[in-house]
Every structure is written in structure tokens, then in C-alpha cells.
Amino acid sequence: MGRRSALALAVVSALLCQVWSSGVFELKLQEFVNKKGLLGNRNCCRGGSGPPCACRTFFRVCLKHYQASVSPEPPCTYGSAVTAVLGVDSFSLPDGAGIDPAFSNPIRFPFGFTWPGTFSLIIEALHTDSPDDLATENPERLISRLTTQRHLTVGEEWSQDLHSSGRTDLRYSYRFVCDEHYYGEGCSVFCRPRDDAFGHFTCGERGEKMCDPGWKGQYCTDPICLPGCDDQHGYCDKPGECKCRVGWQGRYCDECIRYPGCLHGTCQQPWQCNCQEGWGGLFCNQDLNYCTHHKPCRNGATCTNTGQGSYTCSCRPGYTGANCELEVDECAPSPCRNGGSCTDLEDSYSCTCPPGFYGKVCELSAMTCADGPCFNGGRCSDNPDGGYTCHCPAGFSGFNCEKKIDLCSSSPCSNGAKCVDLGNSYLCRCQTGFSGRYCEDNVDDCASSPCANGGTCRDSVNDFSCTCPPGYTGRNCSAPVSRCEHAPCHNGATCHQRGQRYMCECAQGYGGANCQFLLPEPPPDLIVAAQGGSFPWVAVCAGVVLVLLLLLGCAAVVVCVRLKLQKHQPPPDPCGGETETMNNLANCQREKDVSVSIIGATQIKNTNKKADFHGDHGADKSSFKARYPTVDYNLIRDLKGDEATVRDAHSKRDTKCQSQGSVGEEKSTSTLRGGEVPDRKRPESVYSTSKDTKYQSVYVLSAEKDECVIATEV
């Protein structure tokens, strides 16, 4: 049980240590000695066709993990091998494959994991009667057994060992070497030299990668750029290169690219344009220091920048001009007086005075007032420092008052006036249209009201203009406008002026105010008649007849209208102008012989004590409609008459005030007698008041037109 636990632990340890590695444990069998030809049980090896006690020997090798007590039993965790028959009794084994093609010396046990450094080795020498029978399970075949534990480091050197059991000797050697491209103590370091896109390196003794010249990095995939190439702004695909990233330039990619179009600027980062001193603008193309860049001022002048591309030169004495390029002629203003000659110097002048004068500008005279130097009445006074001074009268100037002053030299006269020098004064002779001492006033040409017929005058220089009212023209608006001026007549008509109007004389075949209409051709007989005389008698007669017919028609219409109005005029009021009414019946109406059942007097409210009973006459309003229709006040009449009475009522209905009772009887009859309703029915409108009032009344308002109705509340 303990052996199995140890075996399982060894297997797990081997798996845990397994990594991507590769190595080989090599065992070289060198010599085996079995002098007596005995088996392990001391029996003689028999069988086969050979001599007696001749042991045909083959080997079983078992390599396993380190065990303190080595067990020859499987499993062989690191590998196992069974050789062919290698010899009889005692024999030596050469290197390579010389004895049997199936056997190679040394015996190799490949590893796919890290070499642990320790191992257990079991080598058994076995006897077989037949080369084809290499079974190892039969203990009767065992000649000898070697079991050992060892520590072994990786290396090319062989470890020699000899095992003696008393009757047999076994000399052997072993080592552990790494496969190609594997390095390290456990052959766990893989390194394969390469020179492609995945690396450029060789391998050292311990498997470290050694980069080829010009390459760097963990796998030697990064080329070493040109020495000095900027690490951030440059890169390379091959050793010794220096390729610039976007925005950078130069051999070492350490120069930023300026903004396109930048002239006088620099950059710290790509696409910048930081202007140098004296330059400005988006592209640094605007000169802000013109003086420094162009030095425009000459002759030692001082230059001052005043803005973009502008400057000012402060000239030294004796020079002038925009750039101080012109030398000033100090003699130009003739500083020397009294006939002295001027000599121009670099920044000054010198006066050479005539005889009798001295001073810087020859302003001093050697003469005195005793010599009478002043002319034209000038007053002389001696100067304390020598010389004299002439005080000139009006109109004269000069050192000796020898120059006459021209009073007109200052052009005092305005508006083209001529100046006349009068000695001590001057006179301005004005142009036509101007006045005043200096001819500064424009004469008002509208003062005399030259514009006629209400025209508006506008003054100008020595002239005027008139704005004429409608109907007049001309310079003074005195000429009436010709109505024929704009040719108002058409079709070859002749225009004739008639005061403020015009008349068109039309050509034959045209008519209208402006002869703009084409007239139809007249009958031939009218043409012949018209040709007999120059005056158009036919047209005049036809016009007169039409006018007469129109007047007769108007008169007939007026007569018809008056007759119609007289026919519908109402008769005179039989009751007089002022009556007292009760229940819409006047006094004269109540006296009629009409039997009417009237509501009790206690229930009657007289609201119409006096009223003017009148109607609107048809003569005043021909299309008059009654304001109130005939009203039935719930009066129940006892008609004692017969149908003749009804017909009589019908005949008297047109009478205004006298027919009110009859109309009421007719309506009552039509109400009581359903079968004797007249042919023309009259619609009625009934209005009833509230029963809560003191006076209960019912109004039956007929739609029939009645012009004599007075409202009465019952």
C-alpha cells in the first residue's frame, strides 16, 4: 500500500513539473561478465543448441522517479526498454548499432518535461532459449538485477558506474542531455535561432536570446534606428533608418513641420506658426518691424514703427522727405535781407551782406537816421545796438519802406468781383447779380415778382426761374398751356384751341371726344344728302327727335305716379282730430249699432284717455304697410244680423275709423261660424298674459294689415 502511494506521488510530482521542455536520458551498456554462465538461482543456463551453461543474455531497463527503496516492479515512470539478445555469458557492447539492427547503444529515454535531477534505475540481465522469446515476467530467466538511485545534472559528460553481484559484473555509463534548441538545468529553456519577421537572434549557452547586430527587444524584433533619431517622433523598419512620423521632419525627425504658408514663424509642435519678433498675422507674413527689416530712413534719421508695414522717419537737421532722402535748402526761404546772398550749409546757411549792412541775416544797417534812409514817408528811429528801423505808413513795407503793399493781393473780393487798389484802400467791382462791400450778397431777382398767374419764383445767380401752376407755361408763366400741344385728337383729326379747352374736328368716319371711335357707314341716301351741303342736317334733326321722345316718356311716368298716389289716399277722419278711446274704440265708434259683449268695467284699465287717432296716409308713403294688424281683444259679439250684415261689414272695411267695429264683427262671425269663413283666411297671432296679474287680458293680433289700430290693454 505504501509503495503504491509513493508511486502516485511521484507521478503527480512529475506532472506538476511538466513544462514545454525536451531532453534525453542516455544509458550506455559497456560490458557484462558472467564467467560461470549461471542464472540468478545458480542454475545452469540450459536450452537451445549451444553448449551447456551458456546464457543467451538480453536486458530489461526500467527508469523511474527517485525512490528511497527502489522497487523493480512497474510502472517505469520515466520509461523502459527491452534489448535483443546481446551476447552469451560475458561480452562487451560497442557504441552504436553493431550487434543487432534493433538495438542502438546508448539506450535513449526522451523527456517531455523538465529534468528533475534525480532518478531510479533498474537493469535486469535475462536469459532466453530463443531470440524471439524476450518475455521478462518469468523470474527463472533472471541472471542478475541492478537497482540504484542517482543525482544527475544535465551535461554532455558521461557518468561511469560498475555493478558487481559476486557472480556477474555490469559496467555502464549514463548522462542527461537536452534536445536541440533546449537549454537550462532542466532543459526547460527553448531557443531556436532565427532571422525573420519573428526575430533576429542566436542562442547562448544557457538558451538566452542574443540579438543580431542592429536589433533589440525581447525577441529581437525591434530594429535599432539611426543614432540620434528621436524616439517619440521617429521610427525605423530596418536597422540604421530614421523615418519621421506625421508632422515631423529632418534627419533625426526632431524638427516640427510648420503650418502651411507660414513665412516668418516657428513651431514647437506640428502645424504651429509662432511668429518671430517683428512679424504678425496668421502666416507671420505681416511686417510689424519695418524699420529693422528694411531700414528705410536715410542720412542718419531715426526710424519708428507705427503699425503693420508703416513707419516714420525723424530726420536730422538739414534733411527732409518721407525717408529723409532730401537735403533741405536753408536758403529757399531767402533768409538774407537787404540784398544779402545766401550760402547753403549742411544744416544751416550763411548770409553775405552787401556794403552798409551786417548781422546774421544782414538785418542791421551801418546807416543811421541822420542819413534819411526811410522812403515814402516812413518814420526812422535809431536802434540802441546800432542801425535804424523804419516805421512804414499804411500801404508800404520793406526795411526802408521802399515796397508798396498791394491791398488786392489777398483777394478780398468774392464771387468773381474785380479788386481795384486805391492806395490806402481798395474797391470791389461786383459781377452782375451780386452786391455788398465784398460782393458777397446775391441780388434777389424775385423781389420784383416776375412770375405771373400765381407762379412760384426761385432765385438764382443773376437769374430766376418760375414754377407755373397748371394751365400756364413760359419763363414768366404768362402763356396759357395749349391743350393741343400733346395731340389729344386721334385718327388724323384737327385740334382747335377754345380758351382752356380744345375741340377735335374728326375726319370722315370717326367720332368721339378725341375722334377715337370708328363710326358705321351711313345709308347711301344719307351720304348723297350729306354731299349736297356741308352742314350735317340729318344728324342734327335725329338728335332733336330723340331728345323730344325722352322728355315725353319722362312726363308720362310722372303723371302715372301721381294718379296712383291719389287713388290710394285715405278719406278724412270722421271722428275729428282728438278723440277719447276705450278698448281701441273711439267715441264715434262706440255709438254704432253693434251689439258687443264687453268685459266688466272692474276689469278694464283705461290706458288711452286721449290719443290722436290718425293713420299714415298713402300719399306720403306709397308702399306703406300697417304697423299693427287688426286686433281682436276677446270681445264676444252677438251678431243679430244676417249675412247681409256681414256683407255690409265687408263693404265698409275700407273705411278707416268708421269701419273698426264692422271689422271686429266680421272676425267674430268668422270665429263663431265655422262654415261661413270668408274665402281669404286671415291668420291670427294670440298673445296671453300671466294669470297672476290683476288685469288679465288676451290679445289676438291678426296678420291683416290695418292702418288705424291703437293699442289698448284690457
Curated annotation (Swiss-Prot):
Residues 176-220 form the DSL domain. The modification Phosphothreonine is found at T630. The chain crosses the membrane at residues 538-560. Residues 18-537 are extracellular. Residues 644-656 have a biased composition (Basic and acidic residues). Glycans are attached at N476. The modification Phosphoserine is found at S685, S688. One of its GO terms (cellular component) is apical plasma membrane. Disulfide bonds join C178-C187, C191-C203, C211-C220, C225-C236, C229-C242, C244-C253, C256-C267, C262-C273, C275-C284, C291-C303, C297-C313, C315-C324, C331-C342, C336-C351, C353-C362, C369-C380, C374-C390, C392-C401, C408-C419, C413-C428, C430-C439, C446-C457, C451-C466, C468-C477, C484-C495, C489-C504, C506-C515. There is a cross-link at K605 (Glycyl lysine isopeptide (Lys-Gly) (interchain with G-Cter in ubiquitin)). Residues 711-714 are annotated as: Interaction with MAGI1. Residues 561-714 are cytoplasmic. Residues 1-17 form the signal peptide. One of its GO terms (molecular function) is Notch binding. Homodimer. Interacts with TJP1. Interacts with MAGI1 (via PDZ domain); forms a complex with CTNNB1 and CDH2 and promotes recruitment to the adherens junction and stabilization on the cell surface. Interacts with PSEN1; undergoes a presenilin-dependent gamma-secretase cleavage that releases a Dll1-intracellular form. Interacts with MFAP5. Interacts with MIB1. Interacts with NEURL1B; leads to ubiquitination. Interacts with NEURL1. Interacts with SYNJ2BP; enhances DLL1 protein stability, and promotes Notch signaling in endothelial cells. Interacts with MAGI1, MAGI2, MAGI3 and MPDZ. This is Delta-like protein 1. It comes from Rattus norvegicus.
